[in-house]
């Protein structure tokens, strides 16, 4: 029986709030960023309420005031809408890198916050509750040994956070109950924090992506392709967007018959069209051929129409993301793949990318070897045993084959896996990133994510498990993480071709889990509409686009007409240390890399200004020389100017 994919009860009415510092969401071993927006907790008596004149005469008031100051120093910087749910003093964080440290552990409705004043600067650990996968109790009341009684939180971003409580303090139970309640609000019929957080930015990120504008940018509609509203009420396919681009000569009634032959009704629809050859990338789900090898005349005619829309080629390639053995096995479940006998002039290619369960296990193995410490002596063999980079290679190689077929072969392609919302999204978005320089800009990449991932129904709620305590759910899988990893691999091979930097990619992944923004909530466009997310939550793009200097690559040069062909070879791929191993302070650069980005951007702007000034000077001299040369009363001796 299929699990419900509804995202009902995710939120209630929002409260006004302000943006957080991204630094506060990504630092496990350093003090909190000074730029963090925060407010003082209302639960702490304000020191301003004690008069200075009274303090001069009352030692007790003096002690109370100092105590309040210390309490404020130990509390987290709160976002509006955020409030403290529990606080435990004299808790020990078992840091795997720098050793045990004692301090105060605070749970709010948004974050887990630990601060120790024993070190200088103070030791701070700050993690959003959304990143927590599960919470486990360690030891019992009769446990012997130092730090043997406490809690361990297992996180979705590689970390494990372990805290020791004193049995006699009786704080563990309360902290555990509040973590289980607020880290998993969906399981407790509570709102995700995104519905409490509301901020107006200079730009509304929810308006960034407009499907009509994006299709017009691609030259759609044209004589071969039209935009249809057949799915306006999500009745054709509830996981597709309202507007679809389909062959112009296929009427809406036929689309419905095609939908009945495709898994989940996900018919082939256009993702991208080549501006010159008109070769296209279309995406869909598997055909429902079953073991009997059923056929659909409407589906065959539909793919023929896709092929005919491209006059440059009389062939079409069907890229099935799955290993062939998996595709064959799907026939027993009523699915399958296209027969080359039924689809004339079509060539079927299997890309051998494994399913969500294999990828989940691969990430689990990767986590074991990178956190908390790396075993140097067996590092390469351990990394190879996870198969993580092998999976990254296959995804990149598949996207590369698609891009090459469209660009060099001038041939249209159809891409699908089983349901068309996991591996298909990886392949189409990466191929489009290789083919179209627009998607390599910051805003263009945001549009790409909105279009190929969000509007076309990647099941973020199920794959990430926002606010859900069922950590062993078989639907969890790092599909989007793999996509971002592939993008990072491309930025390594083409360091000047992308407007965004590594910090941009890490920020997206951090907020994939944080539940601070509404961008990655729910499983489909229809569900986001029902939840009214654009009005009730803040878009991640609003936050990012309000401080673009943090996310801009100083080496970027516009290559809008260039097609990128990354090398999908194990020799050219590497583990993304900046993400997977970032919690280890020994693996961090001494200076945050995004600070260096800012310095380089400022330097580039300074040099560009000098170049412009020199160009104006040369232009002015050239104009003056021309005027003097054109005057009959003046004899001008040529002067060579060296700049």
From Swiss-Prot:
Localization (cell): Cytoplasm; Early endosome membrane; Cytoplasm, Perinuclear region; Cell projection, Axon
Catalytic site positions: 417 (phosphocysteine intermediate)
CDD domains: PTP-MTMR2 (cd14590)
Domain GRAM stretches: 68-139
InterPro entries to which the protein is assigned, alphabetical: GRAM (IPR004182), Myotubularin (IPR030564), Myotubularin-like_Pase_dom (IPR010569), PH-like_dom_sf (IPR011993), Prot-tyrosine_phosphatase-like (IPR029021), Tyr_Pase_AS (IPR016130), Tyr_Pase_cat (IPR003595), Tyr_Pase_dom (IPR000387)
Domain Myotubularin phosphatase per the UniProt entry, residue ranges: 205-580
One Pfam family linked to the record: GRAM
GO cellular component: axon; cytoplasm; cytosol; early endosome membrane; membrane; nucleus; perinuclear region of cytoplasm; vacuolar membrane
Chief localization: cytoplasm
UniProt keyword terms in alphabetical order: Cell projection, Coiled coil, Cytoplasm, Endosome, Hydrolase, Lipid metabolism, Membrane, Phosphoprotein
Role noted for this protein: Regulates the level of these phosphoinositides critical for various biological processes including autophagy initiation and autophagosome maturation.
Note on domains (UniProt): The coiled-coil domain mediates homodimerization. Also mediates interaction with SBF1/MTMR5. By mediating MTMR2 homodimerization, indirectly involved in SBF2/MTMR13 and MTMR2 heterotetramerization. The GRAM domain mediates binding to phosphatidylinositol 4-phosphate, phosphatidylinositol 5-phosphate, phosphatidylinositol 3,5-bisphosphate and phosphatidylinositol 3,4,5-trisphosphate.
Family affiliation: Belongs to the protein-tyrosine phosphatase family. Non-receptor class myotubularin subfamily.
Subunit comment: Homodimer (via coiled-coil domain). Heterotetramer consisting of one MTMR2 dimer and one SBF2/MTMR13 dimer; specifically in peripheral nerves stabilizes SBF2/MTMR13 at the membranes and increases MTMR2 catalytic activity towards phosphatidylinositol 3,5-bisphosphate and to a lesser extent towards phosphatidylinositol 3-phosphate. Heterodimer with SBF1/MTMR5; acts as an adapter for the phosphatase MTMR2 to regulate MTMR2 catalytic activity and subcellular location. Heterodimer with MTMR12.
Protein name per the record: Phosphatidylinositol-3,5-bisphosphate 3-phosphatase MTMR2
Species for this entry: Bos taurus
